[in-house]
Amino acid sequence: MALAHTLGFPRIGRDRELKKAQEAFWKGELDEAGLRAVGRQLRAAHWQVQKDAGIQLLPVGDFAWYDQVLTHSLTFGVIPERFRAHGEAGPTLHTLFGMARGVSDDSCCGGAHAQEMTKWFDTNYHYLVPEFSADQQFQLSWEQLFEEVDEARALGHQVKPVLIGPLTYLWLGKGKGAEFDRLDLLDRLLPLYGQILRRLAGQGVEWVQIDEPILVLDLPQAWKNAFERAYNLLQSEPLKKLVATYFGGLEDNLGLAANLPVDGLHIDLVRAPEQYPSILDRLPAYKVVSLGLVNGRNVWRCDLEKALEVVRHARERLGERLWVAPSCSLLHSPVDLEREDGLDAELKSWLAFAVQKCREVAVLARAATEPEAAEVLAALEESRAVQASRASSPRIHKPAVQARLAAIKASDAQRRSPFAERIARQRAGLDLPAFPTTTIGSFPQTSSIRLARQSFKQGKLSEAEYIEAMHSEIRHAVQIQEQLGLDVLVHGEAERNDMVEYFAEQLDGYVFTRFGWVQSYGSRCVKPAVIYGDLSRPRAMTVEWIRYAQSLTDKVMKGMLTGPVTMLMWSFPREDVSREVQARQLALAIRDEVVDLEAAGIRIVQIDEAAFREGLPLRRNAWPHYLEWATEAFRLCASGVRDETQIHTHMCYSEFNDVIESIAAMDADVITIETSRSDMELLEAFEQFDYPNEIGPGVYDIHSPRVPSREEIVALLRKAARRIPAERLWVNPDCGLKTRAWPETEAALVNMVAAARELRGDLARG
């Protein structure tokens, strides 16, 4: 049979045991021995569950105390000086967690800010960015991989250690201090890979998996050349090497990847099925080919019959050189569907989490040589039934939604008048001062708010009691905003647990799991909603809350919604229709809410698109299509209102230059953005492009409890006014205030309002 393996398995545990142990350790409630014991138990359980599912070659090194890239940084001794404790022989778990979370001023190292965290390719997982210096030295400093190999082998498992490849590791990092080329570090780093491979060989390992996902990116020629050089140098080291690529197709890097002097290549045939024939044609006859046929980053069952066609063909071509795997590490999948005892039976039958995906991989591998095995035939029959159910289910396919999609006209995604005409009407109707002040939407989520929501869900509060509790919070938020002198108010979002989940719970076509947790970073786990069918809004979602808030004040109240692209990006999407179609369905549902808010007397509606840039494909040549449908989806949800109704959007990225034209194409009347940490430098993109609409650059960082002074905010606003005409500037924080406490929130907003008034004085004096 073909060999069944996985590239990695979720590390958090079926019941998020790792999260609970991490947080107990950080609070001092669990000692290091206790934390390490939890890690051992989880690793043993995860290896065994994969083995029981039919996986023959088990990954080791996919477990991490916080993040796999951070683990590699410790392994290679890439530890910034601020985290080095004087007198310690080497890094400890305290070092690791300090790099991830920062170190307080009273620790042994003194205060040290955490390393930067960013998205792992185009997933919703985040990694800790390695910090390199021009004189960076590498040395083996962390024994975790070798200890875990011994651990797994002692349990009788056949193992495949997992390493992030040298080129990908350098690509993921950033240079600190004097400018230098990270590739200059390669010759210093490669000897460590040699040491690691030799030590693993000494432990009895036969195969090692070397992850090089940057091979699916647009690589500069220097990096392509470096691949050949690096793997030529590693060729002489012991062990068979499987280079793993995922999250996309190799495209122009296909020849490079196929000809690397290694023993096998893993390719993602979920994201890029079209690369399969070319790989088989280009790969040397001695190499193993690992086919990623089961989606490692979604929750749907594999169409086994369709996948088996590829397996049969590959078996004929490759014989014993065929391996079968998920498309990528199962880190991005929830752990075990069996925990979901509350899910509707039909819906549950369509799903597969990590454990179930392992079984699918094993069935496909066995089917390569034993197509008539009872287990294979039963699995194929079950898969056919699932695919037939999904193809015909009226729960998925809704004629009314499809008819509405088909009826969309180009004019539906355009405001009635150009911005210049709209803004004149809006200014006349809203009658706001120069430098109008507002917030991004949410106010502090106190323990009393969370308790009220929890009690309502558990049936301990009646609906009337819950509504009154939320009304009380809204009254409090409105009263404080009026006292502070803000110009455009918000209701505070007390009723919302999450900016996606709140809306998804009220839309047809979404379902929620109880245990579908995936790791976002460290101990933070998220439970994305699942889009299973055509999406529609059965009733208004926010109107009553906003209408109540508006009834409390004569000032302008802003409605708050989450945009279609963000809803899509932070959910598990369908696989049977495109992301573009799902975004349009969401846009129509949100459009109805925007229109209803306008009818309720709400004159400003904010539609947040926090994930707009996150949706960009990994390859630049795919950007135009994505940006076209993503901007159209925003305009579709925002364009059903009169010119007098002002549409805001909020984005929180650190880079706008390469998408500024698309942001302008969204045609929001006002965009609020995160700029305080860049000292307003991000506004350069809007200045150079001559962005035509109004802008609210964030004037203070909400991620810090620190209260900015009036003088600081004034300085930032004056800097902004040198780039953007004063009449087009709004004044607001960087982001929502959900995670802050009320005292610091009020203190910061007092200074923000005072700063805006000072700028108005400047303007009046000319």
Swiss-Prot record:
GO biological process: methionine biosynthetic process; methylation
Catalytic function, reaction form: 5-methyltetrahydropteroyltri-L-glutamate + L-homocysteine = tetrahydropteroyltri-L-glutamate + L-methionine
Alphabetical UniProt keywords: Amino-acid biosynthesis, Metal-binding, Methionine biosynthesis, Methyltransferase, Repeat, Transferase, Zinc
Single annotated GO MF: 5-methyltetrahydropteroyltriglutamate-homocysteine S-methyltransferase activity
Organism: Pseudomonas aeruginosa (strain LESB58)
Family annotation (InterPro entries): Cbl-indep_Met_Synth_N, Cobalamin-indep_Met_synthase, Met_Synth_C/arc, UROD/MetE-like_sf
Cofactor stoichiometry and binding remark: Binds 1 zinc ion per subunit.
Binding-site residues for L-methionine, renumbered to this chain: 440-442, 493, 608
Protein family: Belongs to the vitamin-B12 independent methionine synthase family.
Pathway: Amino-acid biosynthesis; L-methionine biosynthesis via de novo pathway; L-methionine from L-homocysteine (MetE route): step 1/1
Entry protein name: 5-methyltetrahydropteroyltriglutamate--homocysteine methyltransferase
EC number(s) per entry: 2.1.1.14
Obligatory cofactor(s): Zn(2+)
Pfam families from the UniProt entry: Meth_synt_1, Meth_synt_2
Keyword S-adenosyl-L-methionine on entry: no
Superkingdom, natural source: Bacteria
Function: Catalyzes the transfer of a methyl group from 5-methyltetrahydrofolate to homocysteine resulting in methionine formation.
UniProt cross-references to NCBIfam families, sorted A to Z: met_syn_B12ind, PRK05222.1
